[in-house]
Design a protein with these regions (language model features):
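Conserved alpha/beta-domain cores
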Residues: 1-184, 190-192
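Expand to "…catalyze enediolate/carbanion chemistry for C-C bond making/breaking, isomerization
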Residues: 190-191, 201-205
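C-terminal active-site rim and adjoining tail of enzyme catalytic domains
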Residues: 165, 199-201
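Conserved N-terminal glycine/acidic-rich loop preference
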Residues: 196
Length: 205
């Protein structure tokens, strides 16, 4: 565990999601004892295996519609809402549980064909459509920036996200989360307005 980094992160005024994929329950407990208690999982099965209600959980990986029923009611935030079909299923399951599910809309800001997310240019229209769902609360937007040595490109992606976030925040009072930045680029993301970072190996190793 990187105790020094954990202490440094706790002192900051942004939220930290400790990405716990491939980590054991023991490692999660150890990080929690050091003061970080929000964890992010990529895969539903792994989340179910590790779920502990005393911690806060985010799903941050691509989410299949048929897996939604296993996580609604347990997960605090679904950070990877990227389609209307997925929104409909989250709405259905949240309604069944009698809860309002917090979500972030994942936007595809990178040109990388392997990245998932709703097309960035259509984000406003999509978020407007999502307002019809009574059991979904849109808390903000999320992205995974390009994995590249080109810092200017990454900064440009973060800046576009931040500009959109500020515009959405004015329009929708519930929106308060801009989730961007991981182990390799979180400092850059925070510089460009991120208030939630998702850090895995830098914390756990």
């Amino acid at each position: 565990m990187n105790k020094e980094l954990i202490e440094e992160l706790k002192a900051q005024d942004f939220n930290v999601v400790a990405v716990s994929k491939m980590r054991t329950k023991e490692e999660i407990d150890e990080v929690a004892k050091m003061g970080l208690t929000t964890f992010g999982e990529n895969r539903v099965q792994e989340f179910i295996d590790k779920y502990d209600p005393k911690y806060t959980w985010h799903i941050i990986g691509h989410l299949q519609t048929n897996k939604v029923k296993y996580i609604v009611g347990k997960v605090d935030v679904i950070e990877s809402l990227d389609s209307l079909k997925l929104a409909e299923e989250i709405e259905k399951q949240a309604n069944k549980h009698g809860i309002i599910q917090k979500v972030l809309v994942e936007l595809k800001i990178s040109e990388d064909p392997n990245k998932t997310g709703y097309p960035f240019k259509d984000a406003k229209n999509f978020i407007s459509q999502l307002q019809e769902f009574k059991h979904i609360q849109i808390k903000g937007i999320m992205c995974v920036a390009s994995k590249t040595e080109d810092q200017a490109l990454v900064e440009s992606e973060f800046e576009q996200m931040h500009t959109l976030y500020l515009e959405l925040k004015e329009q929708y009072p519930d929106i308060d989360t801009l989730s961007m930045g991981m182990s390799q680029d979180y400092k850059l993301a925070v510089k460009h307005g991120s208030n939630t970072v998702r850090i895995g190996h830098a914390i756990f190793e």
